[in-house]
Amino acid sequence: MVLLSLALAVPARAAPSSADEEIDGCLACHGQQDLSMTLASGETAPLFMKSELLAGSVHKSLRCTDCHAGLDEVPHPARQYQSLVQFRASFGEACKTCHFDNYTKTLDSLHYALQARGDLFAPTCVKCHGSHGIARPAEPRSRISQTCATCHATISQAYAKSVHGRALIEQNNQDVPVCTDCHRSHDIAGPRNRAWLMSTPNLCGRCHADPQRMKKYGLSTAVLSTYLADFHGVTASFGGQGTRPTERVVALCFDCHGIHDIGKVSGTAAAVFRANLVKTCQKCHRGASANFPAAWLSHYEPSLTRTPLVYLVKLFYTLIIPFIVLGLILQILLHLWRTVTNR
């Protein structure tokens, strides 16, 4: 291992009295574009920092040593790094000092599991949020998807073409979900995590069951309630597990509508368009005939105009069942009265 020194050929200076004074002192060296060091791998690690990045950062009021702890002395004490990847991966350790709650959430995430296995390319705080030019997470929200695209390029391309992605990118529509709305920010679960998979109907329902939001687009808000009431949702409520631990025998939202490539529900190209629906059903129901989808009422409550027969049958049972129950209760009470009077 090669011992790397960050020592700079400048005389020792007195401790700065303010954050601005400390930043100016650090920029005396780190404002030089050619400042760098050579790592054990032979790679060059740049040590230059653009002052304008920090000026527009949410951390602009912090001292440099709030994040770069132990480097308040000049010359700096020696540090050891094997490669540029390891050098960059080490930056995120400073974040937990202030953001401990979010740091503890990452310990349950798929990203941290990759780090724990020694994957130096796994996402860290700095890889997602940046190092010096740190913006507020939601300004603008489209930055979130762009950040995730650094590693998930193929998925990002599919999202950009989806009904959600196009609304965000082309119209700056703030109603649509970005990556973190579905996958969370710090405690990100893997795509095969069973608990997360089975929670996706409620996840989609956070937006699609919102009356104010769906009213803007003329979409039904009964998507979650109708799903939970039909055969797919009932199976999901029991866990939807097959005979093997990894087997799933129930259709969830993304099985029909897509995962990242979610399209409009209207139009002849839609997966849930009546003419295409049989192909969607055949993903699970092999051998399903052309009239198989007719058994599904879509995400709409039965009505006299859309499904009159189903609506009338439901109305009949809604009215008759209370009378049957009341009749049974009356019969029991009469039997009790007869028993008492005959004694």
Which residues does each PLM region occupy?
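Short sequence/structural segments immediately N-terminal
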Residues: P11-R343
